[in-house]
Amino acid sequence: MGTSRYFVRKTTIPPPKRPRRIHVSPCHDTPILFGDEVKRCPWGHLAYGGSCLQSITLRDSETSMEELLPHDVIEYHIMVRLDVKTLLKFKSVSKQWMSTIQSPSFQERQLIHHLSQSSGDPHVLLVSLYDPCARQQDPSISSFEALRTFLVESSAASVQIPTPWEDKLYFVCNTSCDGLICLFSFYELPSIVVNPTTRWHRTFPKCNYQLVAADKGERHECFKVACPTPGFGKDKISGTYKPVWLYNSAELDLNDKPTTCEVFDFATNAWRYVFPASPHLILHTQDPVYVDGSLHWFTALSHEGETMVLSLDLHSETFQVISKAPFLNVSDEYYIVMCNLGDRLCVSEQKWPNQVIWSLDDSDHKTWKQIYSIDLIITSSLFFSAIFAFTPLAVLDKDKLLFYDSTHGDAFLTHDPDTKSYDLPYTSNRCATVVCYFPSLISIL
């Protein structure tokens, strides 16, 4: 006798007092004999034990999901394949489902699965959007909109993410980590780690550098050099997330040490110093970049205009120079930039009429390979001439480059190296700082 096949019919969730059940009905006439193993039926749907599960929704029925499938099958083979928004809705199915979805181990498996299986593009997050013209016309308008997100290749409009810190100026660390982003202020406000998809957030206190800077601000004093910016990343061995401030402390008149490094510990909710700190001065004008368990900085320019890439291993908390940058005789530190493209460490230099982007070879950490070249003549004809180097953000559709001018933050460009074409996929009348991220359920306990 042939095995029946079923799919789940989409219906509305019943009233709370009625049991929430799964309704199943036949999908196709041909038997699917897979045995008790999750696979895909000939029509591409998930299947288990010969039953085709075309979708997972809820309705009143005689048979519960747990009776149809063991929970470990549901968790490891079905729930892990669902996107974040769907899983957030499914938290109301049962206490067991909620417990699973809130489990850090499940959240990590779900993220790993989607990053390995999905070819989808990252989301773009705009931080502290600001329209100076609108404020001048109407002083009642809020100065800043905290967060707004969009997908570059989507026709959908950008979406505002409500937060408790509207109308406050925040900046964002250069790279996201596991769907988390880190907001910071130079000295006015405490920092915040945020999951923009789930809207979870956690505020943490100022580091010692920020406290000194705040004291200077109250006395209307300022530093004689550019202010440093923090980095945010993850110890891949322990799974611990770490915000890091590295700065040239002697230049800032903070102490007599060339550099000082502070790391925040979420377990103790306190900052601590890293000893020894960096053996090299860094460029404060450049944001640190997180790649594969380490944060990276440019070292200060030599008299010949050379710079090196400095790395901090977030597990051992040790510094080392991993490579010389592929460019020589840098005339201005604002003409170079570091970034993460597809989990690869990349550096770029603007030198008219091009801006070239190199990727560091993962095998030897010494060889640089040119992967993109931006035609500055074409980009300047599209909207304006960039004062500083463009900031590369992400790779879309496997090879299309997304980048923007960080001094304005109101226009984004894509470059297709195959067709050598350029496009303006998103523009805004408001300035912002920007970071890319992939949706996740991750939070920091």
From Swiss-Prot:
Database matches in NCBIfam families: F_box_assoc_1
PANTHER family the record matches: BNACNNG10540D PROTEIN, F-BOX PROTEIN CPR30-LIKE
Pfam families, alphabetized: F-box, FBA_1
InterPro entries: F-box-assoc_dom_typ1 (IPR006527), F-box-assoc_interact_dom (IPR017451), F-box-like_dom_sf (IPR036047), F-box_dom (IPR001810), Gal_Oxase/kelch_b-propeller (IPR011043), SCF_F-box_component (IPR050796)
Protein name: F-box protein At5g10340
Organism: Arabidopsis thaliana (Mouse-ear cress)
Positions of the F-box domain: 64-112
